[in-house]
Every structure is written in structure tokens, then in C-alpha cells.
């Protein structure tokens, strides 16, 4: 069933990005009249937007106490602690981070923290699989050599590596690309704090 506008005024509802003029109208209206019933506020302010659109624009972007800028390491740690405690209850978490919106925290979690967790799980799975294969190969090698064979088992361990580290070549963007895909020590320490290590 298609939704059809009940009157000609509903057909004029504007969608898409907000203009600076619309932002100023909404800010001034709320400054003079306060927040109220959002559907009537949109019409009273002269905005051709839905009440929901006005409410979300105000709460997520225009409110004076909305904090701008990157999430700090302290905020990140708090988000991780509260998420471990409450899960995806973003509004409840946002109440403990003044000036941050639930939507901003959710987006931060999904784009930064959750991404790193999935990468770490993938890397741990690959490392465990690799270690298991190495162990199986070492056992097979020792068994095929037999107990009376005088050859020395040459399995790799970090302390036995004698390669030249100076031969490593990195491109000009190595550090910036690596920082986007790797965890900092603060990230690792904060994860250990959550795990009780």
C-alpha cells in the first residue's frame, strides 16, 4: 500500500541535506520557544521538514552541548567498559559521555572498535591455525627422521632467527597506512584491562 499525502502541504516536505538557513531557523526557533512537540515545531518555525527530521537535526548536530571532535582515549575506554557491561544500549552509554550522542557512539563502535576486534579475531584464528600446522609439520618431520637419525631439528623460534632486519624496505606511506590498520599500545592495554589481565 502506497502512502499518499493527505493534503497539499505534506507534499512540500523537504528531504535531503539541511541548509545553513534551515539550521539557523531551527536554532533561533528553539532559542525563542524551546523544544516542544516536534511536528508542530516544524510547522510553526516555517520549516518544510518533518518533526522527526527537526528533532534528529537538533539532538545530533545543533544542540549547543553536542561535543565536536574525535573521541578521546578516555572516552574510548569508557565506551568499551560500558559496552562490555550493557551491550548495544547506545542511549544508556551516551548518558555517561556528556555531549556525545547515542548515534555518534554507535557509529564510533561499529567503524573503529568492532572493526579492530574482528581483525584481531581473524589474526588470532590465522595464528592459531598456523601454529597448529607448524606443530604438525615438526612432529611429522621428527617422525620421518626416526629416533636414530642424527640430524638436528631446525624448527623456527623467534630467538633462533638470524636474518638481517636492516633489509626491510617500506614505502613512503607505510606508517600512515599501518596506523589505520593496527592497534596502538593504548588499545591493547585497554583491551587487557577489560579482560582482567
UniProtKB/Swiss-Prot annotation:
SUPFAM superfamilies: Homeodomain-like. Induction: Circadian-regulation with peak levels occurring in the early morning hours and lowest levels during the late afternoon hours in flowers. Residues 10-62, 63-117 form the HTH myb-type domain. The keyword Nucleus applies. GO terms for molecular function: DNA-binding transcription factor activity; sequence-specific DNA binding; transcription cis-regulatory region binding. Residues 138-158 have a biased composition (Polar residues). GO terms for biological process: circadian rhythm; floral organ senescence; green leaf volatile biosynthetic process; regulation of cell wall organization or biogenesis; regulation of DNA-templated transcription; regulation of flower development; regulation of gene expression; regulation of phenylpropanoid metabolic process. This is MYB-like transcription factor EOBII. Residues 125-158 are annotated as: Disordered. Disruption phenotype: Impaired expression of ODO1, EOBI and several biosynthetic floral scent-related genes (e.g. IGS, PAL2 and CFAT) leading to reduced scent production in flowers (e.g. phenylpropanoid volatiles including benzaldehyde, phenylethyl alcohol, benzylbenzoate and isoeugenol). Impaired anthesis enter and premature senescence of flowers. Altered cell wall modifier transcript levels in flowers. It comes from Petunia hybrida. Residues 38-62, 90-113 bind DNA. Pfam families: Myb_DNA-binding (PF00249). It is found in: Nucleus. One of its GO terms (cellular component) is nucleus. Its main location: nucleus. MYB-type transcription factor controlling the production of volatile organic compounds (VOCs), including floral volatile benzenoids and phenylpropanoids (FVBP), in flowers of fragrant cultivars (e.g. cv. Mitchell and cv. V26) by regulating the expression of ODO1 and EOBI, key regulators of the shikimate pathway, and of several biosynthetic floral scent-related genes including IGS, PAL2 and CFAT. This scent, mostly produced in the evening and night by the petals, attracts the pollinators (e.g. the night-active hawkmoth pollinator Manduca sexta). Keywords: Activator, DNA-binding, Flowering, Nucleus, Repeat, Transcription, Transcription regulation. CDD domains: SANT (cd00167). InterPro entries: EOBI/EOBII-like_plant, Homeodomain-like_sf, Myb_dom, SANT/Myb. Gene3D superfamilies: Homeodomain-like. Specifically expressed in flowers, mostly in stigmas, petal tubes and petal limbs, and, to a lower extent, in anthers and stamen. Also present at low levels in roots, stems, leaves and sepals.
Amino acid at each position: 500500500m502506497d502512502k499518499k499525502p493527505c493534503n497539499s502541504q505534506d507534499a512540500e516536505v523537504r528531504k535531503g541535506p539541511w541548509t545553513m538557513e534551515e539550521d539557523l531557523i531551527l536554532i533561533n526557533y528553539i532559542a525563542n520557544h524551546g523544544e516542544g512537540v516536534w511536528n508542530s515545531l516544524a510547522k510553526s518555525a516555517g520549516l518544510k521538514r518533518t518533526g522527526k527530521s527537526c528533532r534528529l537535526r537538533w539532538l545530533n548536530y545543533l544542540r549547543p552541548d553536542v561535543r565536536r571532535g574525535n573521541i578521546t582515549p578516555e572516552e574510548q575506554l569508557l565506551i568499551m567498559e560500558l559496552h562490555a557491561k550493557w551491550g548495544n544500549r547506545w542511549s544508556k552509554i551516551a548518558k555517561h559521555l556528556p555531549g556525545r550522542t547515542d548515534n555518534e557512539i554507535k557509529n564510533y563502535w561499529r567503524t573503529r572498535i568492532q572493526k579492530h576486534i574482528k581483525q584481531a579475531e581473524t589474526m588470532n584464528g590465522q595464528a592459531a591455525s598456523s601454529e597448529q600446522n607448524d606443530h604438525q609439520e615438526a612432529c611429522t618431520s621428527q617422525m620421518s627422521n626416526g629416533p636414530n637419525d642424527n640430524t638436528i631439528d631446525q624448527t623456527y623460534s623467534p630467538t633462533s632467527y638470524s636474518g638481517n632486519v636492516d633489509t626491510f624496505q617500506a614505502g613512503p606511506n607505510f606508517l600512515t597506512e599501518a596506523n589505520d590498520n593496527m592497534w596502538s599500545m593504548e588499545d591493547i592495554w585497554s583491551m587487557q584491562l577489560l579482560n582482567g589481565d
